[in-house]
């Protein structure tokens, strides 16, 4: 039996087909006559321009992956393949906002290679900066016997962040929790921290090892808000390697406020450190207040 020409049927009379394979043929008119093209070739040509435009966003490097917010759940543990991708600096299938849920805490990707090429000892290790969605617990910057806010001398920023009880002891619980969740993969790197205060301003600092530390205003907001600045005569010791906003907070600002007040490490006055208020605004508070501990750390 001879085949019936397609031209004897209307398009609406043809059998519907929704699962074409690469070898399927599509009739196409090039302006001179009717020809054929495979589905594979048609598809490739149709997306050619789009693929060229989005390709840079899919490159396997920190710059490309810092530019995309995804927010995908990555499960309850970092896989061997994921650690390998971090180590290689390709960050395959890892994007800003992705998170692991470990011990009831969402640990969310905030940046890729944020500290690379910084520090008095150069950071050359590829890494991912992680920030928990919630505060791990509450603690004071300066401890009191009551465990809560007290007036007067209890509120001091003497010694800066390095001299605070938060730095010296109150972060230990967070370090234990985080090192258990990411065993053997918490990166030790070098950052510059305040260790002296004069007239309510940071007046000195030093390079320190960092594994788990409070964030600073620049990491959260993209700039200083309450931190004292140069007035033309006095220049506060605001030296830091964290000069830019974490991509997590840049792409999704709602991640800054978690409906709790949590500490930042910046010295604001002789008695107050910076914090993020429960209502979402930038704030500062007396050192003896017990506020949330929401630290940042790197895995590699």
Predicted segments with their positions:
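Extracellular repetitive beta-rich solenoid segments
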Residues: 2-49
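Collagenous Gly-X-Y triple-helix signature in extracellular proteins
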Residues: 51-300
């Amino acid at each position: 039996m001879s085949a019936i020409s397609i031209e004897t049927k209307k398009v609406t009379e043809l059998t519907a087909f929704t699962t074409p394979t690469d070898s399927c043929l599509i009739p196409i008119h090039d302006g001179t006559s009717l020809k054929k093209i495979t589905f594979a070739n048609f598809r490739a040509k149709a997306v050619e321009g789009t693929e060229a435009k989005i390709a840079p966003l899919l490159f396997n490097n920190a710059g490309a992956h810092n530019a995309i917010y995804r927010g995908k759940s990555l499960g309850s543990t970092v896989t061997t393949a994921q650690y390998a991708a971090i180590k290689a600096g390709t960050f395959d299938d890892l994007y800003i906002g992705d998170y692991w849920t470990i011990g009831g805490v969402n640990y969310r990707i905030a940046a890729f290679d944020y500290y690379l090429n910084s520090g008095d000892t150069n950071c050359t290790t590829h890494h991912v900066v992680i920030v928990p969605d919630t505060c791990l617990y509450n603690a004071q910057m300066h401890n009191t016997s009551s465990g809560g806010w007290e007036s007067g001398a209890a509120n001091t920023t003497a010694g800066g962040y390095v001299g605070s009880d938060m730095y010296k002891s109150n972060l230990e619980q967070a370090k234990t929790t985080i090192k258990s969740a990411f065993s053997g993969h918490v990166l030790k790197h070098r950052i510059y921290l305040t260790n002296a205060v004069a007239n309510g301003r940071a007046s000195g600092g030093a390079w320190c090892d960092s594994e788990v530390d409070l964030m600073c205003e620049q990491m959260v907001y993209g700039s200083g808000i309450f931190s004292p600045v140069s007035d033309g005569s006095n220049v506060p010791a605001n030296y830091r390697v964290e000069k830019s906003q974490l991509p997590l907070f840049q792409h999704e600002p709602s991640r800054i406020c978690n409906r709790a007040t949590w500490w930042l490490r910046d010295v604001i006055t002789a008695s107050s450190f910076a914090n993020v208020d429960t209502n979402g605004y930038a704030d500062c508070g007396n050192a003896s207040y017990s506020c949330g501990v929401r630290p940042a750390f790197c895995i590699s």
